[in-house]
Design a protein with these regions (language model features):
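Structural signature of tandem-repeat unit edges
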Residues: 1-5, 23, 27-56, 67-80, ...
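Short, solvent-exposed loop/turn and secondary-structure capping segments
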Residues: 12, 45-46, 132
Length: 185
C-alpha cells in the first residue's frame, strides 16, 4: 500500500484481514500487510467500535482480532502503537517496531500466539502493562540500542516462554521483571 490511510481505509483492511468493525469474523484472507509506504491520518469512519484514526498512530484496537494476519510491516513514520492494537492476531508471526515509534500501549500484542521474535526500535520510551502478554511462542526480544531510559509496564512478557533478551547498552528498564529469561545479552 502507498499513500494516506484514514479510519475508513483501516476498516476495509480489517475486513480483508478477517474481522469487521464490530468484531465479527469475515471471510477476508489478507495475511501479509505492508504499510511501509503509508501515512496514517485523522479522518474517515471509525475502524472498530467507536475508535477512529489518528495521525501517525496505529490506534487502540486497530487490528484487534484480525486473525488472518501473519506479517505486518509497520510504517517508518509511525509514532505510536495503541492499546490492544494487534491483540488476538493469533497468526501474527513477524513484526518489527520501527525506530520512530515512541509508545507501545497496554496489551498491544496480547495473544499474538505465533509471534516468535520481536524487535523494538531505539526511540521507544514507554511500553504498557502486559504489552506482550500470552504471546505463547515468543522466545526472543531485541531492544535496539537507544539513548533514553525505557519505561516498561509490569509483566511485559507475562505468560511468554521468553528465552533470550537482547538489550542495547544505553537502555535502562524501570518496573521490569526478568522472570524466567534464560539468556540476557
Amino acid at each position: 500500500l502507498i499513500g494516506e490511510l484514514n479510519g475508513t481505509d483501516l476498516r476495509y483492511i480489517r475486513e480483508m484481514s478477517g474481522c469487521d468493525a464490530n468484531g465479527k469474523e469475515t471471510g477476508g484472507c489478507l495475511s501479509v500487510l505492508d504499510l511501509s509506504g503509508v501515512n496514517i491520518v485523522d479522518g474517515g469512519n471509525t475502524y472498530y467500535g467507536n475508535y477512529s484514526a489518528s495521525d501517525n498512530k496505529i490506534g487502540d484496537y486497530t487490528f484487534y482480532k484480525c486473525a488472518r494476519l501473519t506479517r505486518v510491516i509497520i510504517p517508518d513514520n509511525l509514532l505510536s502503537i495503541g492499546e490492544g492494537a494487534f491483540g488476538c492476531c493469533y497468526n501474527l508471526s513477524s513484526v518489527v517496531i520501527p525506530d520512530k515509534v515512541r509508545d507501545i500501549g497496554e496489551l498491544a500484542f496480547y495473544r499474538c500466539e505465533s509471534l516468535g521474535v520481536v524487535s523494538i526500535g531505539c526511540d521507544v520510551n514507554t511500553i504498557g502493562v502486559y504489552a506482550f502478554r500470552s504471546c505463547i511462542s515468543l522466545k526472543e526480544a531485541i531492544f535496539v540500542d537507544g539513548n533514553k531510559p525505557l519505561q516498561v509496564g509490569d509483566n511485559l512478557f507475562y505468560n511468554c516462554p521468553l528465552e533470550k533478551l537482547y538489550v542495547g547498552r544505553n537502555l535502562k528498564f524501570e518496573n521490569f521483571s526478568f522472570g524466567k529469561i534464560k539468556t540476557l545479552m
